[in-house]
Regions:
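Active-/binding-site microenvironments in catalytic and ligand-binding cores
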Residues: 1-118
Length: 118
């Protein structure tokens, strides 16, 4: 348990289903709100939660197992590395994964799990 912050990228995601939270998004948030506290929980608001219940809109496809056509926002490698440097405790996002839908390497998972970030 710790302090929580919300980084809102709904505007960027509205026009780009494959948008990824960037390091610039994080530093912009910090310019307005101050440094992300260590051991905090970072919540990323993409606006994708409004599509919950509609597989095609939420995932980009409604065909089970069709991973080639997944499209939803996530967190970039650079953003994950910056969050790890900030020593956050945990991360949450309103999409199906912290990696964006079209990922093939799941690098965001690798970076954050490697830093023991839940």
């Amino acid at each position: 348990v710790g302090p929580a912050i919300v980084i809102d990228i709904t505007q960027a995601c509205a026009g780009n289903a494959d948008y990824q939270l960037s390091a610039a998004d994080i530093t912009s948030w910090e310019t307005t709100h101050g440094a992300i506290p260590g051991e905090s929980i970072v919540l990323v608001r993409t606006g994708w939660g409004k599509f919950w219940g509609d597989k095609k809109k939420y995932l980009g496809t409604d065909t089970p197992g069709d991973t080639a056509n997944l499209h939803f926002p996530g967190i970039s490698r650079e953003a994950a590395e910056l969050l790890a440097q900030r020593k956050i405790e945990a991360i949450g996002i309103d999409t199906a994964s912290i990696d964006y839908g079209a990922t093939k390497d799941f690098i965001t998972h690798q970076v954050l799990n490697g830093a023991n970030i839940y």
